[in-house]
From Swiss-Prot:
HAMAP family: NDH1_NuoC
InterPro entries per UniProt: NADH_DH_suC, NADH_quin_OxRdtase_su_C/D-like, NADH_UbQ_OxRdtase_30kDa_su, NADH_UbQ_OxRdtase_CS
Lineage: Bacteria, Pseudomonadati, Pseudomonadota, Gammaproteobacteria, Lysobacterales
Subunit structure: NDH-1 is composed of 14 different subunits. Subunits NuoB, C, D, E, F, and G constitute the peripheral sector of the complex.
One Pfam family per UniProt: Complex1_30kDa
Compartments, record wording: Cell inner membrane
Protein name (database record): NADH-quinone oxidoreductase subunit C
Length: 250
């Protein structure tokens, strides 16, 4: 780990004792996992004390099914992927159904989050030429609520609206939290892993009503043509210089 990166990590650990700091090697990419109750306070301190004056991006993440594989590619590849499906995983169910395919058996080399929804922000300090990734998890999967950062970085307004629209994450204190991408009256949040790929409704023109109407999906059958797998394949190995592992400092 570069001396400059190590020094910065030490400063973060000293300033935020309840925050988990991790560094992805060999590039030294620093990430913070912040308790949701401290989300605003930590971000404000990063802006004021560490000169992270710009939030370049904020997004939501749905960890439902994270670390789970749907397909048995070892024994049935020659016979077709559809013969190896075990249960209905993400994308293979209709509206109102729920994924039933396997789970992480604890042998995976990564940590599977206990909470489902996370908010991820990328910060930039131009003064110190640094980038930082900050993440927090909503404590309630049924109604994920995270404090809004609009008072810290006003430009985050539309980013939070997008995360609300696509993931259903409620940003408490946001001045205008409404959908920004989907249509009026849209049902559900399309980037959630339990949102069917077929959607909930389809659009057609009604001759009697002389207008476009929304009706339940009946003409599309849920199917996945690309396998959802987790495997060690050299073709997908990290390029030289890319991050290959993450080291939790604290």
């Amino acid at each position: 780990m570069a001396e400059q990166t190590l020094s910065f990590v030490d400063c973060l650990m000293s300033r935020f004792p309840t925050v988990r700091v991790s560094v992805a090697q060999p590039r030294g990419e620093i990430s913070l996992d912040v308790p949701v109750v401290e989300w605003c306070a930590v971000c404000k301190a990063l802006r004021d004390e560490f000169d992270f004056e710009q939030l370049s991006d904020l997004c939501g993440v749905d960890y439902l099914g994270y670390g789970n594989a749907e397909w048995d590619t070892t024994d049935v590849s020659a016979q077709g992927f559809s013969r190896g499906v075990a249960g209905k995983a993400v994308g293979r169910f209709a509206w109102g159904e729920f994924p039933s395919a396997g789970s992480n058996d604890g042998t995976q080399p990564w940590d599977v989050p206990q909470e489902r929804f996370a908010v991820l922000a990328h910060l930039i300090s131009y003064r110190h030429n640094r980038r930082l990734r900050v993440r927090c998890f909503a404590s309630n999967d049924a109604l994920p609520i995270v404090a809004s950062l609009t008072d810290v970085w006003p430009g985050v307004n539309w980013f939070e609206r997008e995360a609300f629209d696509l993931f259903g994450i409620v940003f408490e204190g946001h001045p205008d939290l409404r959908r920004i991408l989907t249509d009026y009256g849209f049902i559900g949040h399309p980037f959630r892993k339990d949102f069917p790929l077929t959607g909930n409704v389809e659009v057609r023109y009604d001759e009697e009503k002389k207008r476009v109407v929304y009706v339940p999906v009946t003409s599309v059958e849920p199917r996945v043509s690309v396998p959802r797998v987790i495997r060690d394949d050299p073709r997908f190995g990290a390029a030289a210089g890319e991050s290959t592992h993450s080291e939790t400092v604290k």
